[in-house]
Amino acid sequence: MIALLALSSPLAGSLAGQSQASPSGQISGVVSDQTGAAVQSATVIFSRGSFTATQVTDASGKFVFSGITAEAGVVRTSAAGFQTSDTDWRSGSGPLEIVLRPASAAEQVTVTANRTGVRLVENATSVVVLSGPDLDATAAFRLDDMLRQVPGFSLFRRTTSRTANPTTQGVSLRGLGASGASRALVLSDGFPLNDPFGGWVYWDRAPRESIQSVEVASGGASHLYGSDALGGVINIIRTPPDRNSVSLEAAYGNENSPDLSLSASRKMGPWSVGVASELFRSDGYIAVPESLRGAIDTLVNSQDATGDVTVRREFADRGDFFVRGSVFGESRHNGTPLQTNSTTIRELDFGGNWDAREFGAFQLRAYAGRQNLDQSFSSIASDRNSENLTRTQRVPAQQVGFSVQWQRTVGTRQHLVAGVEESNIHGQTNEQGYFNGLPTSTSAGGGREVNWGAYAEDIIRIAPDWLLTASGRVDHWLNFDAFAPPNPAVPVGAASLPDRSESFFSPRLAILHKLTSNISLTASGYRSFRAPTLNELYRGFRAGNVFTEANSNLRAERLTGAEGGAIATGWNQRLMLRGTYFWNQITRPVANVTLTTTPSLITRQRQNLGSTVSQGVEMELSGQVSNSITLSGGYEYTHATVTSFTVDPALAGLNPSLVGLNVPQIPRHQFDFQARYSRPFILLAVQGRFGGNQFDDDQNTLLLRRYFTLDATASHSLRPGVDVFVAVENLLNRRYDVARTPVLMVGPPILARAGLRLQFGAR
């Protein structure tokens, strides 16, 4: 709380009349709202230089400091739902009369994706926050589909995680170029969800009913989070098991799609236990358009189950400790009889938070997990009436890691953050080759990766209307015990590869200037990086008739970026508008580069391109039109192109220069909107999403056409805590392009479901 107050802006507050002088060495006063009502439990901090003292207002809004030897200082007052007030005080003045103004919705939202709580309107980073009500009002029931309402969010392909192969579920922000590996870090309560071997994300691991909110922070974040945060951070905040509560949602939809999500907790004194689980299955749909289908085209579908148990121990107001065990499993059919995959994950997490008073606050996170991915690939005849098994893979991986963070407020104008992290990953791919249905060769590739990082951040209010943030992080990573088959045709054996290491320094400087009580300007510059995953280094894959080779010589991607924008609030703080211009250059981006093309097979390899540049503008608008109607929307224009590329001389005729071409999978325009009508017993909401043209390949020959989709949901409360609802995704039933492999694949048809939601206790 003190850290939050130290960062809060002196937006409002007034000192009314000064009556008789307070006794020497004493500061007294009363805190009220604009109606004159007393504000109870407001936090009042007096500061002078490095000296600070804290009091809390009583039921009548009064506070008293005694034993004050300073002649002058600043009294900062804060309370939930109100703007923070700064009041100058001098010895001999009368009791203070402090009036607090209500905070806008944006001012009440605290963002934690930057490792410390900062109010949304005081954050120089572009952040979109989806609250619990926002998530409840979304027709989508997979987290990645919910996040598509955030401008700039995209996966490797447009396909939803309901049916997409998990290795295509890497996330991209701001047009940095999606691939199997994410270019943004996804966290759940501070623990990474990115796959340790491949960098993609299993979006179903966090049960939907256990999610309290989601923060999407765009822009390079390696200065705090290291390699995986090249383009930003997605922070999933789980509901803590700090009260007796039950939240259950059960639904059934077409495509034979049942879904059950549960979150429950029980508090017993300082101890509490939380349970969360989700079960889902769907028969899916045929992804190939009817005019192109053959005998082997079958349903793409999936089923998954996830569950976790959390045990938590609180220590009064000093902190807590918790342990969480989780399991996850899924299986998928990928559109033909022979193409399938399945995954199992088990993980154990530990965490603790401790307030050491004047020594600061400490946070610990540690985790260990193991997993296994099984997958099969086939070659498909040109008439799509037959297929042959070409390869099966088993990919085991293990990871362990920890992070320790310290933060402390210095006076009322400065906040310090520092921490260290380490992760250790071990993974390999074991492959069996087939020809004419018979096994022909075995091969293996993999290795170990260790990452170390240390970071520090200084957030300082250099003037009442200026907030400066300076941060930096040093990372060093090492790949060792690596091996790969010297040639896919070699029957058995693997060649050892030399150890490799790299280091990188990620600085960031950001500033926020409050022009008026309603308008702020922001600017920042940063560098970020992403080390190649074990998957990119050592595992190839096949999608349709496109085979992508691994490359053990890949080096880390490096990003240099800058952004500037403005935040404006108005209409009695019921309207917020945020606009940002961004520019990002990536040197050595890892891309799937086409090597050869034949009618039956396209061969690509992961390579470090020369460089790409992504620049554009993003806009976010939200408004509370009335007590019942909320409107919001976002738009992003992104111009992402290849700016340098070295052609392989041996393939110059087949592999022309890519300079000037668009980065694959990135549309030029994205737009979304949401409209919500809510009353005590009814909720109506619609969400629309538009995506412009984009290309599925590096040579810009496989076009995915623009699309628009509309979702809607309605719910009715039968009694407090008991709701019935209907939700429809793709209300217009438009089968838009999602991939070309090179055969066109289209997205899901309309999905309608109905269900029951039970909520007892606060979510």
Question: What are the roles of these predicted feature ranges?
Answer:
Residues 24, 32-37, 43-44, 78-82, ...:
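Short, acidic, small-residue-rich periplasmic hinge/interaction motif at the N-terminus
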Residues 127, 144-195, 212:
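Extracytoplasmic beta-strand/coil segments of soluble accessory domains associated
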Residues 191-218:
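Short acidic/polar hinge/loop motifs at secondary-structure boundaries
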Residues 222-223, 235, 243-251, 263-344:
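Periplasmic-side early beta-strands and strand-to-turn transitions of outer-membrane beta-barrels
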Residues 312-328, 344-490, 496-497, 512-514, ...:
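Face-selective signature of the C-terminal outer-membrane beta-barrel domain
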Residues 314, 458, 523, 557-562, ...:
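Conserved C-terminal beta-signal and adjacent last beta-strands/turns
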Residues 362-379, 512-514, 520-526, 530, ...:
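Membrane-embedded beta-barrel scaffold of Gram-negative outer-membrane proteins
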Residues 468, 476, 574, 578, ...:
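Gram-negative outer-membrane beta-barrel transporters
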